Amino acid sequence: MPIEEHIAREQERLRAKQRYRTLPETGARRGPYITVGGRELLNLSSNDYLGLGSEPKLLASWMAQVECGGADGRFAMTSSSSRLLTGNFPVGGELESAIAKAYGSEAALVFNSGYHANTGILPSLSTRHDLILSDRLNHASIIDGLRIAEAEYRRYRHADYDHLEELLASAAGKYRQVFIVTESVFSMDGDLADLRRLVDLKKRYGAMLIVDEAHGVGVYGQRGLGLCEALGVLENIDILIGTFGKALASTGAYAVMSGLFREYLVNTMRTLIFTTALPPMMLSWSLATFTRQLEMRREREHLLGLAARLRETLGDAGFETPGESHIVPVVLGEDRAAVAMAAALREAGYHALPVRPPTVPENSARLRLSLRADLAVEQIDALASTMQSLRS
């Protein structure tokens, strides 16, 4: 069968299942609102958890610095090179130093994206003599990192730490190094990893623990350093991965680690070496947002309070709302049910996108409500009331 015919059939199959994706065009943002199709909707599908992307004072302060310029090239629009050539600007070092200091770590390393981090770190650190144990619901970028790495890998049942321990016990003495990889906040179910249990297992079996805090940074911990900070286990994490593209309202990612690991990754990590570095201007903005979020304890508390309120209200109304984080999934089952609810909410003034298989398991299509700290209690209550009326 010619490739064009195969693709056409696959597209028809996706359309028949209501799983055909397109790139929706969005317009201006105004606080928690987004313009879509000429209408201003309350945005419940963004990862800008703290609202930093539209904080006027922060943006004005940063823009004033941009207008003054910088002799060290910190506001250049492009790096035009890999970091190992001519793309390693001083502002990148400032950002990494600020991150390492905040975490009390020896070193930090900035990457172009969380995808670059997760597809590069494991293949660099592991060999064919190693084993990687990964939570089954880890992000696609982690899964791709597993596939690229030469090490063997197993995926333990989601949050089933008894299963993980069985795998650790059976691997004892058979590998040079065992790695445990988990997210802290799982983005589709909104649940949290038991990091204290994972630290205990890491210590007992001599494993290396890597935690992806993509959805935890900015939201958890007194200084927004993530769930590891909130649970007091930071010093027990071998590598912590964070992202600038969510609560920090920028682009790129970082990893916190020992100086030894950092030096090794600089020399071996293909997704760091063989790519053009981030523009210095974006590194400068990331430094501004990272510094600002360290002080946003009140916003974090408000955000988590909103999530608890919405989850309880919808749960009392008969909706299935698993998890316990600022990400509130509303599981509706069939694909068409999720698509219909999203369309009805759009008519009511809300931008809440459906998530369907294969992103989530079959018969668990859902709305993934991503809450923001700049939402008001009244807006959350109105959303819950609207969803109840649409269901009845």
Swiss-Prot record:
Keyword Acyltransferase found: yes
InterPro entries membership: Aminotransferase_I/II_large, AON_synthase_class-II, PyrdxlP-dep_Trfase, PyrdxlP-dep_Trfase_major, PyrdxlP-dep_Trfase_small
Positions carrying N6-(pyridoxal phosphate)lysine: K246
SUPFAM superfamilies attached to this UniProt entry: PLP-dependent transferases
Pfam families: Aminotran_1_2 (PF00155)
Top-level division of the source organism's lineage: Bacteria
Catalytic activity: 6-carboxyhexanoyl-[ACP] + L-alanine + H(+) = (8S)-8-amino-7-oxononanoate + holo-[ACP] + CO2
Similarity annotation: Belongs to the class-II pyridoxal-phosphate-dependent aminotransferase family. BioF subfamily.
Function statement: Catalyzes the decarboxylative condensation of pimeloyl-[acyl-carrier protein] and L-alanine to produce 8-amino-7-oxononanoate (AON), [acyl-carrier protein], and carbon dioxide.
PANTHER family per UniProt: 8-AMINO-7-OXONONANOATE SYNTHASE, CLASS II AMINOTRANSFERASE/8-AMINO-7-OXONONANOATE SYNTHASE
Name under which the protein is recorded: 8-amino-7-oxononanoate synthase
Species the sequence originates in: Chlorobaculum parvum (strain DSM 263 / NCIMB 8327)
Taxonomic path: Bacteria, Pseudomonadati, Chlorobiota, Chlorobiia, Chlorobiales
